A protein has these predicted regions:
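Short, acidic loop-to-helix structural element flanking the phosphoryl-transfer center
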Residues: 1-20, 26-30, 59
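Asp-based, Mg2+/Mn2+-dependent phosphohydrolase catalytic module
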Residues: 26, 30-142
């Protein structure tokens, strides 16, 4: 995990509430947030125990998350590193952002993978945005 003071500052400057929605447990989340210098940025956390250990991408988990934090579908965005976890949020009307490790590498690795990624992005229709640089993506949002 790469810490980023810049990303922490950008997240702090974003309007609206920010929540963590994870298949990990809360203890892991706390350790990661501490390492990233982001302990006081988020308004809440929904970890795997909150869903009785049912992970994303099950629809019921997103419904529970939405209900816990009383989210308005029209003003909710989901940032996720696994694109499959964006399908249900998209159906719910959320903006979806697929955060990849290295988009250029993923798109150019080989023909089959490039076609698969393009199919996911273009044909599946559940990804609103794709980025491999979260800091710059968020800078352009604010």
């Amino acid at each position: 995990i790469r810490d980023s003071i810049h990303l922490a500052e950008i997240l702090k400057s974003l309007n609206g509430k920010k929540y963590i929605f994870t298949n990990a447990n809360f203890e892991h989340v706390e350790k990661v947030l501490e390492k990233l210098h982001m302990t006081n940025i988020f308004d809440g956390c929904f970890d795997i125990s909150e869903s009785d250990y049912m992970p994303k991408p099950h629809k019921e988990v997103y419904d529970s998350f939405q209900n816990k934090f009383n989210l308005d579908n029209s003003s909710t965005a989901m940032f996720e590193d696994l694109h499959i976890n964006l399908r249900e949020p998209h159906k719910m009307g959320w903006q979806t952002v697929w955060v990849t490790n290295n988009l250029e590498y993923n798109l150019n690795k080989d023909v089959n993978q490039q076609e698969d990624i393009q199919k996911i992005i273009d044909e599946k229709g559940y990804i609103s945005h794709v980025t491999d640089d979260l800091e710059n993506f968020l800078k352009n949002v604010i």
